[in-house]
Amino acid sequence: LGFLVSEDVLGPDGNSMGAFMRCDQGDKPVDHHTLNNIQLPGDNYPGPYGHSGYEVTDSVDDLMAGHYHMKTIDEYYHEWGVGRHLLGSQMYDYWRDTHGFTHEHWTDGDLLDASIPENKASFRDVVMAQYGPETPSTFGVTLPVDQIDKVRAEQPTLPDLIKEMEIAAKKGA
């Protein structure tokens, strides 16, 4: 399909569980990823549609203006952010619509050309940020907005879940 792997995502057991992929445009720099496929473990993460991302202009000010505008609209639920991803380095802000789908607004991400080789990254790196709040347990899961608070109260954050997975992988090794 003309994609290059930017990051091969490794699970706690060391096996690949997904990838961040970019379009191959030769020596022309392109966004760190256009497509991200991750197989999350367990029954709580069935792996359907995760989220759509929308680039705002090159301005952090525009991202923040959008954040505060979204807070004034009673139709959206804030999911995660504002922060900066480790992988791809973009600043992000995630919101849910009334149907429970997640939408990312982002800016200022890495640009890579075809000469940049594939990198190996841990699943922990996917959900961690250079700065920003911890990743909620509901991230990457499509569910009705009225269920989000209940799920978050019952389940750990994604970093907590990953820690449990890493401990289980060490015990099984």
Indicate residue ranges for each PLM-predicted region.
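Intrinsic, low-complexity N-terminal interaction/targeting segments
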Residues: P29-N37
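Short amphipathic alpha-helical segments
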Residues: H33, P48-S52
